[in-house]
Amino acid sequence: MVPLPIWKPIFAISNSIAQNLTRIESALAMVKNAGLPPAAISELSRQAKIRATHYSTRIEGNRLTLEETAEVITGRRRIFHGRERDVAEVRNYWDALTRIEEWAAKGRPVTEELIQRIAGIVLNGRRSGLAPYRDGQNVIRDSMSGGIVYMPPEAFDVPGLMGEFVRWIDQAETDEIPVVIIAALAHYQFVTIHPYYDGNGRTARLIATFILHRGGYGLNGIFTLEEYHSRDIAAYYDAMDVGEHHNYYMGRADANLTGWIEYFTGTLSDVFEAARQQALTYSNSSTIAEPDELRRLDHRARTVFALFLRQEYIKSSDVATILALSERMSRIALSEWVNDGWIIISNPSKRSRKYSLAEPLRRYIDSLKH
């Protein structure tokens, strides 16, 4: 198959977009300079990921509440009779979000393989392989009338369009197009191609989040863009509805995307401003010096450390859940952390082994509670 030319999205940097980008940069700088302690970052990130998981799946019709979503993610409740699919969607989105944060931290590029891996987790869980593109036509219908809202490109064209799509992202980064605009356009184009029968919206939002994290706009994971999309779902869908016709081949492929970028950057600027306010609140209220042992922890270790803010002991199953790992990999990670000296084995029983914080970090946790 001869590669298609690189996708050339049509848009202009309007005054609104320029102002939004300025607000985003300002909030980003303030959060970076807020001096948030790692413990606060870990807890804020955990809360944001739970909200992101809830609201992104809710957009697609998931029936679990925010509290129920948190129960599924933390393992406090695993079964909701009659809502098994909702539970699986929440679990899978959390796992995918955990993975993209790790991949972004490693600087992995956007490739078709990465996208197919994200989609695989969204659709079938963390042990899934690459998700193949659809092999037939799909349509998006109005949930009330049943009428066709959008008809994506034919399955035959999907591989070529996806190849063109990832090449554009690579070229856009080379051309130093602002990261936020790349994320906005990536979100739009993935949904436009609609390469899967299901999970396109969730995967598109994850791709946009990955690009933001990878490009330095991750804010340590303390923001929730999905929540703001969900607050006004009509505005979200209206902003993406830029074509004059519901058929991909009759206008949407060549649509002007300035309006969508205005929506995306405006929403993100509101999200970043909320994160800035939250960061300042935590920074001003935190006067206790953090121990060196805590500052040396990497991202995964800090995520696990945050568990001790709510419980005295943890088990390998807790680590497996929060980091989207297998039980075996969680035990390996715990063994490494025991050797590093920041956690200790409290109950050596192989069947019910428990871990707690080493003394310096336990004292720090205790000081936060008084």
Label the predicted regions.
Residues M1-H370:
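FIC/Doc superfamily catalytic core
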